[in-house]
Amino acid sequence: MALYRTARRPLQMMLFSRLGNPEQNYSSWARKDASQSAFGMFVRLFSAHAPAAAEQMSLIKQLRERTSAPIKDVKASLVDCNWDIEAAQKDLRKRGKVLASKKSGRAATEGLLALAQNEGKAALIELNCETDFVARNDIFQCLALSLAKQALLTENTAQQASGIHPVGPECLEDLMINLEHPKISGETTVQNAITEVAAMMGENVKLRRGFVMSTSLPGVLSTYLHTSPQPGLGRIAGLLSLEIEDGNSQLDVLHHVGSELAMHVVAAKPLFLTKELVSSDALESEREILKSQAESTGKSQMAIEKMVEGRLRKYYEEVVLMEQKFIINDAVNVKTVLNNLSKEVGSPVKIGSFFRMEVGEGIQRLEATSADEPVAQAA
């Protein structure tokens, strides 16, 4: 028996050395077990308030479809709002307005022109964004078309006269607009709609400018949009009004020729309607350039003057609409096209005004020149 006790003592000492004092060890186990129980209770309580993983994914998908916001923002708003989808949608709008405000200083050189038109009147606006990816988005395009329709509805004393009249952002931003899109529907102000779309797209979205063209009846107003993703949208626009003395003339013929002339305006980029309307500054500048070029030939003064006059005629053919070669048939100029049209309809036809605008022109330059701004001129 004594031998047995003696043999057992080293084994006990080895166990004690590894486990420590049994009483102390029991106390540490109790504390550890209690802490694990408390953590387990916390996890169970938290899990009782958060939906299951499948339901979470469903809520994220629903809110993503409603708002088109990035998934990480959608999930963050849902978590912050205890997975209440309505509250999360409001939270996303607040986040979006802050984000849109931060991005408002970034250059927005892409975008679209949107056109709305009725009898004798057309409105053209430019809505900018940062990338052509956003310009292709259907929400962005819906906003652009809605803004053009709103611009068409504006009325002021200046617009009652024929010609081209500016409709700047300040004229539109406080007006109410109804966006007919499932992800951004409802009535709100123009400025709020732009801010909300900017938040959804994650880019700076800006209404840059707008114009209204009107014509007195009888007459037609023709338009052409280049690089058009859908009717009413494009990157380059040409507008042109044809006026006729006899209101009973063949208006369908006028519409056809007017559409071709609007296309011509986009392609040929005229700066002036007639030679008489060429600005004195532009003419003097061109004359000085041509004279300097002619003098370098070393010819007589009389020969130099003839060279300058000949080259001025070429200049008129480049920048004056009535003198330009018609893009549909370059055997004739635009003036001849109008003369032939007048004979066909049996009444004099003239161009009342024309207008050309392109997305992003002049934005990236510090000083805009005549080539950087929309070209418009009336007779």
Swiss-Prot record:
One term under GO cellular component: mitochondrion
PROSITE patterns: EF_TS_2
Compartment list: Mitochondrion
Chief place where the protein resides: mitochondrion
UniProt keyword Ion transport present: no
GO molecular function: translation elongation factor activity
GO terms under biological process: mitochondrial translational elongation
Superkingdom, taxonomy of origin: Eukaryota
Stretch forming the transit peptide: 1-45
Alphabetical UniProt keywords: Elongation factor, Mitochondrion, Protein biosynthesis, Transit peptide
Purpose: Associates with the EF-Tu.GDP complex and induces the exchange of GDP to GTP. It remains bound to the aminoacyl-tRNA.EF-Tu.GTP complex up to the GTP hydrolysis stage on the ribosome.
Protein name per the record: Elongation factor Ts, mitochondrial
Organism: Ricinus communis
